[in-house]
Amino acid sequence: MKIGNREFDVTNRTYIMGILNVTPDSFSDGGKWNTMDHALKHAEAMIADGADILDVGGESTRPGHTPVSAEEEAARVVPVIEALRKHFDVPISVDTYKGSVADVAVQAGADLVNDVWGLKYDPEMAGVIAKHDAACCLMHNKANTEYNNFLIDMLAETQECVNIARKAGIKDERIILDPGVGFGKTYEMNLETMNHLELFQHLGFPVLLGTSRKSMIGLALDLPVDQRVEGAIATSVIGVMKGCAFVRVHDVKENKRAVLMTEAILGRNIK
């Protein structure tokens, strides 16, 4: 799979997506990187630590977050994306569910659109992605936790995202799927999702796993958000073993080492 100018071996490897939130209220790092200088320094550190992609977010998607306008979100992410493109040779993702933000972000240099609503929030989003021939990550999400059969329904609802993408003209080779741990799911459902990540492989697309610092880890370990690194590493290891092509993390160095060690144990060619 090609993202930006880089080829990703999504059938044999697991890559690190480093999180760069330029928001004042993200659940774990809001306000830390929302100045240009800090954002660039953090990006440089994540690349040095082994990040393969940087995911830039301008609006928190944590439960109870304060929504921002598309104009404000774009004003946060576009200058950062432009600066990243100027200073670093690394694929860039924009974390947004608004088509207008995705449009200007891709024009600014983003290679991938990471949509936490899987094209179901903004009817313009799929067309924007198709127009630019951008890569996209489509996450399973819903506004409640009501399912008839959780796993079957989750897979069917994720397939709906794929259908929207295809109808808009997005090519299959541009699509990544995210099971959406922490979104539209109870604690028990999140654990069940982790236990059955391999089911997402049957949909025929690379899978991205995003669990870093999330409440599932906090509930399992009874730890605050700033003490969940080890829990996130455990989920990343499971992700590698279940065939995920990407893991989206805050703590790049720790997760990168865990991923590489797991790949070595599994006999994957990492040299």
Model segments located where?
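SAM-dependent methyltransferases
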Residues: 1-13
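Active-site-adjacent loop and "lid" segments of alpha/beta metabolic enzymes
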Residues: 3-5, 28-37, 41-42, 61-83, ...
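N-terminal binding-site loop/beta-alpha segment at the start of enzyme catalytic domains
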Residues: 9, 16-37
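Catalytic domains of carbohydrate-active enzymes, especially glycoside hydrolases
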Residues: 41-57
